[in-house]
Amino acid sequence: MPQLNPNPWFYIMLMSWLTFSLIIQPKLLSFTSANPPSNKTSTTTRTLPWTWPWT
């Protein structure tokens, strides 16, 4: 069964992960986020239940 021979598949997997790790990932991490995280604490709004007119 040729698909169990790890010789070409391991090389392909290794090259694709190296390409991702060394080339693509630093380019993606250099972008600035559109919504940077803030230090503000989130406030919860109190919502009151609305009475339905037909009940």
From Swiss-Prot:
Region named Disordered: 35-55
Transmembrane regions: 7-24
InterPro entries attached to this UniProt entry: ATP8_metazoa, ATPase_protein_8
GO molecular function: proton transmembrane transporter activity
Record localization: Mitochondrion membrane
Stated family: Belongs to the ATPase protein 8 family.
Subunit structure: Component of the ATP synthase complex composed at least of ATP5F1A/subunit alpha, ATP5F1B/subunit beta, ATP5MC1/subunit c (homooctomer), MT-ATP6/subunit a, MT-ATP8/subunit 8, ATP5ME/subunit e, ATP5MF/subunit f, ATP5MG/subunit g, ATP5MK/subunit k, ATP5MJ/subunit j, ATP5F1C/subunit gamma, ATP5F1D/subunit delta, ATP5F1E/subunit epsilon, ATP5PF/subunit F6, ATP5PB/subunit b, ATP5PD/subunit d, ATP5PO/subunit OSCP.
Function recorded in the entry: Subunit 8, of the mitochondrial membrane ATP synthase complex (F(1)F(0) ATP synthase or Complex V) that produces ATP from ADP in the presence of a proton gradient across the membrane which is generated by electron transport complexes of the respiratory chain. ATP synthase complex consist of a soluble F(1) head domain - the catalytic core - and a membrane F(1) domain - the membrane proton channel. These two domains are linked by a central stalk rotating inside the F(1) region and a stationary peripheral stalk.
Name this protein carries in UniProt: ATP synthase F(0) complex subunit 8
Gene: MT-ATP8
